[in-house]
Amino acid sequence: MPYSTADIRNVCLVGPSHAGKTLLTEALLHAGGKIPEKGSIEKGTTVSDFTTREKEIGHSQYNSVCHLDHEGIHVNLIDTPGYRDFFGRAVSVMPAAETAAIVINATEGVEEMARRMMRAAHDQRKCRMIIVNQIDAEGVDLEKVFNGIQDAFGKECLPMNLPSADGSKVVDCFFQLEGDETAFSSVGEAHTQIVDQVVEVDEALMEIYLEQGEELEPEQLHDPFEKALRCLLY
């Protein structure tokens, strides 16, 4: 099926080794209906680790391109190796991507490889998102992880999604004004922080928000939100 360029997204998954980039790729491919079940690193059945050597040692050495479709959008995912020896190989994919997704292991927090990848994405003027993986691991303090992210990359790093208090699901903080109790903070607080930051890049929206006191609809936030993502705040 042919796609227009407006309907294609190119996202590279970057970050330290053992952050879970390859298994995240498996989960996304499975959710997108591209594979019948998620592969296993131990069994050597992941899509990304396709060479014999990668299957033997249990970690990525090469970049791997996969794809899925979601609501009319064709998404190209580029899984990259995380060991520092392969930094050059991993960062080489950024020119082909619009967005760099920096994957962080919740048990480790912000590691040096995540900092280097964030810096590289910033220098190449890429949109950046941070994905906190392995949030269900034993002993994880998500609030501490979140504070560590803001300390490393700036207060403009805000949660778009938060896990529910019982960890059973993910709670959207962008489209919802309030909702389920979350693991820390609250949906309302997170939503307000996002809106406060988004309206800073749109004067007309700022006027509505401040002077008229109107509650902004998600549709009003969509384009300014994309603009805010592209602002080099950090």
Q: Which positions does each model-derived feature cover?
A:
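P-loop NTPase catalytic nucleotide-binding module
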Residues: 1-19, 37-38, 105-233
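P-loop NTPase switch module centered on the Walker A-proximal segment
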Residues: 1-104, 110, 153, 186, ...
